[in-house]
C-alpha cells in the first residue's frame, strides 16, 4: 500500500464500520526504532561511521506497534494508521514563520528516508502524510471524527502530551502508560491551558508570567482590569498610578474575556493571544477540508 493523503484514506475507508481504529505517531515510532538500531563502526583505522541496522529497526518498530495493539483486547485486529509530518508546516506559513525556529535541528537516523519508503509499501498499515500538516494534525483530524473514516472510535497512541487537546477519542499517553478518555470539554480546556502556558520548545511563549499556574486560573477564572488612583501622600503625592485589580466575571463575561484580561495585563493584544492559540492547536476534523486542502484557523469563537 502506497503512502496516502487524507482524501485517499477517506475514499479507501468508505463503507467500513470498524469498532475502533488505532492512530499512531509514525514520526515518533520510526525515529525511536531507528535510533535504537544505530551503531558506530570502523572500516579502517581512524575512520568511524555511523550505521543503522534497518532490519533491527524494522523489528523494533513492528514489536512496538504489536505491543500497543495488544494493550487491550478490544484493540487487537483494529486498523492501524501511522501518521507522518510533511516538509512544509502550515503554522509557519499561515501563523508565525518563527514556529519551532528555536529547535535545534535533529539529525535523522542513517537511511531514514529509505526506511520510510520501504515502510510506506507495507500492507499492514495505513501510512498517511498530508501536505502542510504535521503528523499530529493528521492524527487529530482522524481521531476527532473517526466515523468519517469508517470507525466508531479512535485511540491516539503517542508520547506527546499535546494530544490531550483532541476530543472524542481515547489517548494512550505512552510517557505515562495511562489511557485518557477525552471529551470536547476536556480537550478545549487543555488547548486553552497550552495557549496560556505556551511551549517554548515549539517556539510560542503563551501569556508571560503564567506557566503551569494557568491550571488554577482556568479552574477559577477571573477578570483583571486597570484602575487608576491618585496618590494622596508621600513624595509622589498627586501622581496618578494604575493598578490591576482582580474581580469575578459578571454574567455577560466569558472565559475568553477573562483570558483577554490577563493577556492585556501582560501587554498582549487579543490578536496576539489568538495567535498563541493557533500555534497550540492540533487540527480537528472540522478545521481541515481534506478535499481542497483548506485549513480553518482557530478563533475563540470557532
UniProtKB/Swiss-Prot annotation:
Q: What is this enzyme's EC?
A: 3.1.11.3
Q: Could you confirm whether the keyword Nucleus appears in this record?
A: no
InterPro entries, alphabetized: 5-3_exonucl_a-hlix_arch_N (IPR020046), PIN-like_dom_sf (IPR029060)
Pfam families for this protein: 5_3_exonuc_N (PF02739)
User: What reaction is this protein's catalytic activity?
Assistant: Exonucleolytic cleavage in the 5'- to 3'-direction to yield nucleoside 5'-phosphates
* Molecular-function GO term, any one: double-stranded DNA 5'-3' DNA exonuclease activity
Q: Which UniProt keywords apply?
A: Exonuclease, Hydrolase, Nuclease
Q: What does this chain do? A: This enzyme is essential for phage DNA replication; it is believed to function in the removal of DNA-linked RNA primers. It is also necessary for host DNA degradation and phage genetic recombination.
Q: What is this protein called?
A: Exodeoxyribonuclease
Amino acid at each position: 500500500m502506497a503512502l496516502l493523503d487524507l482524501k485517499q484514506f477517506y475514499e479507501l475507508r468508505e463503507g467500513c464500520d470498524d469498532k475502533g481504529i488505532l492512530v499512531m505517531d509514525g514520526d515518533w515510532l520510526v525515529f525511536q526504532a531507528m535510533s535504537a538500531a544505530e551503531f558506530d563502526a570502523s572500516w579502517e583505522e581512524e575512520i568511524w561511521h555511523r550505521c543503522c541496522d534497518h532490519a533491527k529497526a524494522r523489528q523494533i518498530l513492528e514489536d512496538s506497534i504489536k505491543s500497543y495493539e495488544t494493550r487491550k483486547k478490544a484493540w487487537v485486529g483494529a486498523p492501524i494508521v501511522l501518521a507522518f509530518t510533511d516538509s512544509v508546516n502550515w503554522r509557519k506559513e499561515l501563523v508565525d514563520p518563527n514556529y519551532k525556529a528555536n529547535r535545534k535541528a535533529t539529525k535523522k537516523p542513517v537511511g531514514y528516508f529509505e526506511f520510510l519508503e520501504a515502510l510506506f509499501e507495507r500492507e499492514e498499515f495505513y501510512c498517511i502524510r498530508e501536505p502542510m500538516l504535521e503528523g499530529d494534525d493528521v492524527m487529530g483530524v482522524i481521531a476527532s471524527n473517526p466515523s468519517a473514516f469508517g470507525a466508531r472510535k479512535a485511540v491516539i497512541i503517542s508520547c506527546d502530551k499535546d494530544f490531550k487537546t483532541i476530543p472524542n477519542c481515547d489517548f494512550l499517553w505512552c510517557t505515562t502508560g495511562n489511557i485518557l478518555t477525552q471529551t470536547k470539554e476536556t480537550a478545549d480546556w487543555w488547548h486553552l491551558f497550552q495557549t496560556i502556558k505556551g511551549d517554548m520548545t515549539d517556539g510560542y511563549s503563551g501569556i508571560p508570567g503564567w506557566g503551569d499556574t494557568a491550571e488554577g486560573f482556568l479552574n477559577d477564572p477571573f477578570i483583571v482590569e486597570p484602575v487608576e488612583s491618585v496618590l494622596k501622600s508621600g513624595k509622589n503625592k498627586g501622581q496618578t498610578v494604575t493598578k490591576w485589580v482582580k474581580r469575578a466575571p459578571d454574567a455577560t463575561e466569558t472565559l475568553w474575556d477573562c483570558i483577554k484580561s490577563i493577556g492585556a495585563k501582560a501587554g498582549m493584544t487579543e490578536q496576539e493571544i489568538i495567535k498563541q492559540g493557533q500555534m497550540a492547536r492540533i487540527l480537528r476534523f472540522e478545521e481541515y477540508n481534506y478535499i481542497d486542502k483548506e485549513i480553518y484557523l482557530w478563533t475563540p469563537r470557532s
